[in-house]
Design a protein with these regions (language model features):
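A cross-family phosphate/adenosyl-ligand binding-site feature
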Residues: 1-121, 127-184
């Protein structure tokens, strides 16, 4: 693969599929990409920041108000430095925030500050939530603004049912990202 060493920001949200994002971060780091991770409070309930720090070999960003001795606002710097921003698992809540410009934590402020063409969103939720008209309207709005939507897939869900809404598998997410990460 001919690729430049591009900067990737992975924004991890609070869904059970957060554990799958560990594989995504590990694989991207193994491919020599610079991978930064930002996590919501909910994400930290599923996977600890130390896991992502170990996999990426970089500090994990968890707090909007913890700006490490830098005069640049952290959320602006993260948004500007990233060539690609992956939101995974993208919960219904975060999808709604992105669609409507709501920014009340580190991840949502980063996403609001980022150019839409940088964003790749991997939805993850229960089938009923995925099929909710509000979620579908938000997804349509994101697509109309040029955001890439990866999945979701159909299969076994944490609620012990089979349906559409589960986050795409890590290898599928990486394959969707690679065209944006290769030299043109």
């Amino acid at each position: 693969m001919t690729a430049t060493k591009k900067n990737i920001l992975v924004c991890v949200c609070g869904g059970i599929a957060a554990y799958k994002v560990c594989h995504v971060v590990s694989q991207l780091a193994q491919r020599q990409f610079n991978v930064d991770v930002a996590m919501t409070n909910g994400a930290q309930k599923f996977v600890g920041p130390l896991t992502f720090e170990t996999l990426s070999r970089r500090p994990v960003h968890t707090d909007l108000w913890n700006n490490p001795s830098d005069s640049d606002p952290q959320h602006i710097k993260l948004a500007q430095n990233a060539d690609v921003i992956l939101v995974a698992p993208a919960t219904a809540n975060m999808i709604g925030k992105i669609a409507h410009g709501l920014a009340d934590d580190l991840v949502s402020t980063v996403l609001l500050a980022a150019a839409p063409e940088k964003l790749m969103v991997a939805p993850s939720m229960n089938e009923q939530m995925w099929n909710n008209p509000a979620v579908q309207a938000n997804i349509a709005l994101l697509r109309s603004r040029g955001l890439a939507i990866i999945g979701p897939e159909s299969g076994w869900q944490a609620c012990r049912t089979v349906g559409t809404g589960r986050m795409s598998e890590p290898d599928s997410i990486i394959q969707a990202m690679l065209p944006r990460l290769t030299v043109q």
